Regions:
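A conserved hydrophobic helix/loop-capping motif in glycosyltransferases and polysaccharide synthases
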Residues: 2-12
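Short, well-formed alpha-helical segments that are part of the catalytic scaffolds
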Residues: 11-25
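A short, amphipathic alpha-helix embedded in the catalytic core of nucleotide-handling enzymes
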Residues: 22, 72, 99-107, 170
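Short beta-strand/loop segment that forms part of the nucleotide-sugar
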Residues: 29-40, 57-59
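Active-site-proximal specificity loops/subdomain of glycosyltransferases
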Residues: 41-81
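Short beta-strand-to-loop acidic/aromatic patch adjacent to the donor-nucleotide binding site
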Residues: 82-93
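Conserved donor-nucleotide/metal-binding helix-loop-beta segment in metal-dependent transferases, i.e.
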Residues: 95-122
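Catalytic core and acceptor-binding pocket of nucleotide-sugar-dependent glycosyltransferases
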Residues: 117, 122-181
Length: 181
C-alpha cells in the first residue's frame, strides 16, 4: 500500500482543496495521511480530516516538511505501518486522477525515488515538494542534523550538501531517481 502524505502548516484552504481533489482521485491501494506541523491544538484541521476519513497526525512545528519526513523515516510519529510513501507539501496539487498509479509505475526494481521534479538549479537535486520512496530506501537516508530543526538543515538535505543530498544518497545506494512525466 502507498501512503500519500500531505504536510501542512497553516494553510487550511490548501488542505481543504487537497482533500476535495483526493475525493475525486483513484485511491486504489492508497491511504492518505495528513501531518500537521503546529505548536497548538487546532481542531479545525483535525475535524476536516475526520470529515474526509483521513488519518491526521499533529507534530511540533520543528524542521518544516523535512523534519516531518525525518520523523517518519526514524519511526518517531504514530504513523501507520508503511512500505511506500508519496510525500507532498500542501501547495502541490494532483493534476491527474491517477497520480498515485503514475508514481507507483515508476517504482520498478532498481528505482529508489520517483519524483515530480529533478532540478538542475543550484545543483542537480530532487525537489522535495513531491516524491515517492520505499521504506527500505528511506530508512538508509542520513540527515545533516538529528533532529532537523532549521530551514538550512532542509536545504542541506535537498541541495546544499557537498555530497550528501537526498539525490546523491539514493544514487550511492545504486538506485535510480526517476522523474514522473
Amino acid at each position: 500500500m502507498t501512503h500519500l502524505v500531505i504536510v501542512v502548516y497553516n494553510r487550511y484552504d490548501n488542505l481543504k482543496h487537497w482533500l476535495e481533489c483526493w475525493s475525486q482521485c483513484d485511491q486504489t491501494d492508497a491511504q492518505l495521511v495528513v501531518i500537521h506541523n503546529t505548536d497548538k491544538e487546532d481542531w479545525q484541521y483535525q475535524h476536516l480530516c475526520e470529515v474526509y476519513n483521513v488519518t491526521y497526525i499533529q507534530r511540533p512545528n520543528v524542521g518544516y516538511d523535512i523534519g516531518a519526513f525525518q520523523d517518519v523515516c526514524r519511526g518517531r510519529l504514530n504513523f501507520p505501518d508503511w512500505q511506500r510513501l508519496l510525500w507532498v507539501t500542501d501547495d502541490t496539487f494532483p493534476m491527474s486522477k491517477t497520480f498515485i498509479k503514475e508514481f507507483n509505475d515508476q517504482m520498478e526494481p532498481g528505482t529508489g525515488v520517483a519524483c515530480m521534479c529533478v532540478s538542475n538549479h543550484v545543483k542537480r537535486h530532487i525537489r522535495t515538494t513531491g516524491f515517492m520512496i520505499d521504506r527500505t530506501t528511506a530508512e538508509k537516508l542520513t540527515f545533516c542534523a538529528d533532529p532537523v530543526t532549521s530551514k538550512e538543515d532542509c536545504y542541506q538535505f535537498e541541495h546544499r550538501s557537498r555530497r550528501d543530498t537526498f539525490l546523491e544518497q539514493v544514487e550511492r545506494m545504486g538506485l535510480k531517481v526517476k522523474q514522473v512525466a
